[in-house]
From Swiss-Prot:
The lineage of its organism: Eukaryota, Metazoa, Ecdysozoa, Arthropoda, Hexapoda. This is NAD-dependent histone deacetylase sirtuin-1. Transmembrane segments: none annotated. The modification Phosphoserine is found at residues 618, 621. The active site is at residue 331. Residues 72-95, 798-813 have a biased composition (Basic and acidic residues). Optimum pH is 9. It comes from Drosophila melanogaster. SUPFAM superfamilies: DHS-like NAD/FAD-binding domain (SSF52467). The gene is Sirt1. It is found in: Cytoplasm; Nucleus; Chromosome. It is an enzyme of class 2 (transferase). Residues 41-67 have a biased composition (Low complexity). It catalyses: N(6)-acetyl-L-lysyl-[protein] + NAD(+) + H2O = 2''-O-acetyl-ADP-D-ribose + nicotinamide + L-lysyl-[protein].
């Protein structure tokens, strides 16, 4: 949501219509967590307080009195360190003109509007400079007025019986179209509350721009907040989760029934089956790794009294190993563990033996008679697992999905955000809330520095230092060591990089390779085309069309594939290519089965080779979420008959298309001149070794346009030059006779079709999947019987005795070329 930022449209709502006026901007209001449907409580005490407040302000209008009572009926759960407070009850009205008559409603309304205008003018004149400051610091949701009146407006909508989908459609029409139909209303109300409380994006400071400014800020700042993510621990050797051989991929192999690899960290799944977590917990267990230069840099800030707090999203406890005391582990850590039943706590050493033995540790207080923990690799029934968790097991105090952050985070952050004078973000994508809100929670006047491999487009930093975090920290320490040898001791590399305004020109060898492959494909297309006509062209067309569909899909989240070999700007890695081929194979299986069925109806039976195989339903899902390559064939060692589906796959002809190959696009870091770092023309972005940014446009733009024109005019979906699509598509199979793939859910399928329809400037004639989908809906209507209106299929080579009859039928069915030209 943070990347696809959509401005909320509430222009038709006036804050004074909500019954409470804009309060004094100097008053502090803590943020409220609005849990609709979960924390709606009736309270007589709050009603009495609301009535007492209404009595005290006798000049308050009747509408405000009713709103106050409504507001008093709701209690909301706030931060853990604060008491519950009423929404809308924390704002008081300023007294109105005492000469107003309560009996004259129309006059009251007119006078109220006039008074409101006067008050607004007085506020603007009386508070000098605060209006601009509040506008800049409106991202601070706790001190801004706007989120408060938005929540009061949302509360009014809730009590008037509005449907949450209608509310979402009124403020965010684009987002409302993508809501799932089965989403509960309480979830939507909760989402709306968080959405309206979302802080505004901060504007960049004009006074902080250069790398020298960063060094100056570090030298003079005394209360620095450092927010760290996984990027600071990459060089420590901690295994990753999402690579080909990462934890998630191996987890799916060992636990094929796991609905999603991330369920390993889902609290609800953990309560049902804790085995996946304890099977791989030893790989991320602390004590086996050493701190990185980033950790030592943060420790030096603390030693010199400059560190206000280190907020870390990591659970590796390397901050503790580095000796950092002023640290908040936002997502918990392995340092302690708690019982899931009685909340008994113990330290990490008590679980160490069980963790490394891959056993599920039981609570010594809840199950004192159990001599040994349960082996996580031993197969047990669901009932045994449920009973095991209910009896009490030990869970490390890391924050799982579905759990709240530690109370310490909310308590400390409430004070730190108002006193910090510099924010440094190192190695984090800032996509997980509420930690992602830290940059927007501190005052907008506080400088913010980003040290990361990639840019964060959903946030605005004053200076972006892009590259390997260890390399960047090393250069910062060199700059700081001019007058202090303590910083020089942290330098792990003696080389000092110099600033450069120029990048090396991109290598053109990749261009020549790309054009050579296009020329080779053009020259060899005629001979290959003849061989294609002598084979089962139905499978060829299915293969090419599926390739086109996957190629147009681009990047799809949670789809099992991330890029394609057809139209992606980058060349796919081996893992991505394997994942794509796996999905394409399943698509071809479905299409070939339909083809075989159609051939049986037409009496066109032919010898075909079949292969029986087994596939895991749990692996073949659209929710891989990071699994890029996994074996789809079940081995006898872990085959479970209840989880298998027997399939008959039709083997397509062994015709291997020539994939479109592109040279690897160079990153800006790969074009750095030796011994330099690059200063971008925007004057606040810098590229160091290891950066994953692409700022060169002369590589891909011209080639992409030339390649697109070449494909649209001369080549088919395989890249073979020949007749246009119109000729080839006359006998093609309608891909929409079946779903695109059993792996693709309807939403993703619609997304792919949309990308295909809108992906090119010149839509291909008679080959648009959108047109085929429309035609399929019409064709799928009930018909009396299959007669002559059968979707055209490209048949096998007809025998000599049927050629003449076929030519006669075609001449009768198709109009002369003159008529086609006239049309």
């Amino acid at each position: 949501m943070m990347e696809n930022y959509e401005e909320i449209r509430l222009g038709h709502i006036r804050s004074k219509d909500l019954g409470n006026q804009v309060p004094d901007t100097t008053q502090f209001y803590p943020p409220t967590k609005f849990d609709f449907g979960a924390e709606i409580l009736a309270s007589t005490s709050t009603e009495a307080e609301a009535e007492a407040e209404a009595t005290a302000t006798t000049t308050e209008p009747a509408t405000s009195e009713l709103a106050g009572k409504a507001n008093g009926e709701i209690k909301t759960k706030t931060l853990a360190a604060r008491e519950e407070q009423e929404i809308g009850a924390n704002l008081e009205h300023k007294t109105k003109n005492p000469t107003k008559s309560m009996g004259e409603d129309e006059d009251d309304e007119e006078e109220e509007e006039e008074d409101d205008e006067e008050e607004e003018e007085d506020d603007e004149e009386g508070i000098t400079g605060t209006s601009n400051e509040d506008e800049d610091s409106s991202s601070n949701c706790s001190s801004s007025v706007e989120p408060d009146w938005k929540l009061r407006w949302l509360q009014r909508e809730f009590y008037t019986g509005r449907v949450p989908r209608q509310v979402i459609a009124s403020i965010m029409p684009h987002f409302a179209t993508g809501l799932a139909g089965d989403t509960d209303d309480s979830v939507l109300w909760d989402y709306l509350a968080h959405l309206l409380n979302e802080p505004k994006r901060r504007n960049k400071l004009a006074s902080v721009n250069t790398f020298d400014d960063v060094i100056s800020l570090v030298k003079k700042s005394q209360k620095i907040i450092v927010l760290t993510g996984a990027g600071v621990s990459v060089s420590c050797g901690i295994p990753d989760f999402r690579s080909t051989n990462g934890i998630y991929a191996r987890l799916a192999h060992d636990f094929p029934d796991l609905p999603d690899p991330q369920a390993m960290f889902d609290i609800n799944y953990f309560k049902r089956d804790p085995r996946p977590f304890y099977k791989f917990a030893r790989e991320i267990y602390p004590g086996e790794f050493q701190p990185s230069p980033c950790h030592r840099f943060i420790k030096m800030l603390e030693t010199k009294g400059k560190l206000l707090r280190n907020y870390t999203q990591n659970i590796d406890t390397l901050e503790r190993v580095a000796g950092i005391q002023r640290v908040i582990e936002c997502h918990g850590s392995f340092s302690t563990a708690s019982c899931t039943k009685c909340r008994f706590k113990c330290n990490a050493d008590a679980l160490r033996a069980d963790i490394f033995a891959q056993r599920i540790p039981v609570c010594p207080q809840c199950q004192p008679n159990k001599e040994q923990s349960v082996d996580a690799s031993v197969a047990v029934t669901e009932e045994e697992l449920r009973q095991l968790v209910e009896n009490g097991i030990m869970k490390p105090d890391i924050v799982f999905f579905g759990e709240g952050l530690p109370d310490e985070y909310h308590t400390v952050m409430a004070t730190d955000k108002d006193v910090c004078d510099l924010l440094i973000v190192i190695g984090s994508s800032l996509k997980v809330r509420p930690v992602a809100h830290i940059p927007s929670s501190i005052p907008a006047t506080v400088p913010q520095i980003l040290i990361n491999r990639e840019q964060l487009h959903h946030l605005k930093f004053d200076v972006e230092l892009l590259g390997d975090s260890d390399v960047i920290i090393n250069q910062i320490c060199h700059r700081l060591s001019d007058n202090d040898d303590c910083w020089r001791q942290l330098c792990c590399d003696e080389s000092v990089l110099t600033e450069s305004k120029e990048l090396m020109p991109p290598e053109h060898s990749n261009h020549h390779l790309h054009h050579h492959l296009l020329h080779h494909r053009h020259c060899s297309s005629e001979s290959e085309r003849q061989s294609q006509l002598d084979t089962d062209t139905q499978s060829i067309k299915s293969n090419s069309s599926a390739d086109y569909i996957l190629g147009s899909a681009g990047t799809c989240s949670d789809s099992g594939f991330e890029s394609s070999t057809f139209s992606c700007g980058k060349r796919s890695t081996a893992a991505e290519a394997a994942a794509i081929e796996r999905i394409k194979t399943d698509i071809l299986v479905e299409l070939n089965e339909t083809t075989a069925l159609s051939c049986d109806r037409l009496g066109l039976e032919g010898p075909q080779t079949t292969v029986e195989s087994y596939r895991h339903l749990s692996i073949d899902s659209s929710k891989d979420s990071g699994i890029e390559q996994c074996d789809n064939e079940a081995t006898p060692s872990y085959v479970r008959p209840s989880n298998l589906v027997q399939e008959t796959k039709t083997v397509a002809p062994s015709l291997t298309p020539i994939p479109q190959q592109r040279g690897k696009r160079q990153t800006a870091a790969e074009r750095l001149q030796p011994g330099t770092f690059y200063s971008h023309t925007n004057n606040y972005s810098y590229v160091f070794p290891g950066a994953q940014v692409f700022w060169d446009n002369d590589y891909s733009d011209d080639d992409d346009e030339e390649e697109e024109r070449s494909h649209n005019r001369h080549s088919d979906l395989f890249g073979n030059v020949g007749h246009n699509y119109k000729d080839d598509d006359e006998d093609a199979c309608d891909l929409n006779a079946v779903p695109l793939s059993p792996l693709l859910p309807p939403s993703l399928e619609a997304h792919i079709v949309t990308d295909i329809v809108n992906g090119s400037n010149e839509p291909l004639p008679n080959s648009s999947p959108g047109q085929k989908r429309t035609a399929c809906i019409i064709e799928q209507q009930p018909t009396p019987a299959i007669e002559t209106e059968i979707p055209p299929l490209k048949k096998r080579r007809p025998s000599e005795e049927n050629k003449q009859q076929t030519q006669i039928e075609r001449s009768e069915e198709s109009p002369p070329p003159g008529q086609l030209a006239a049309v």
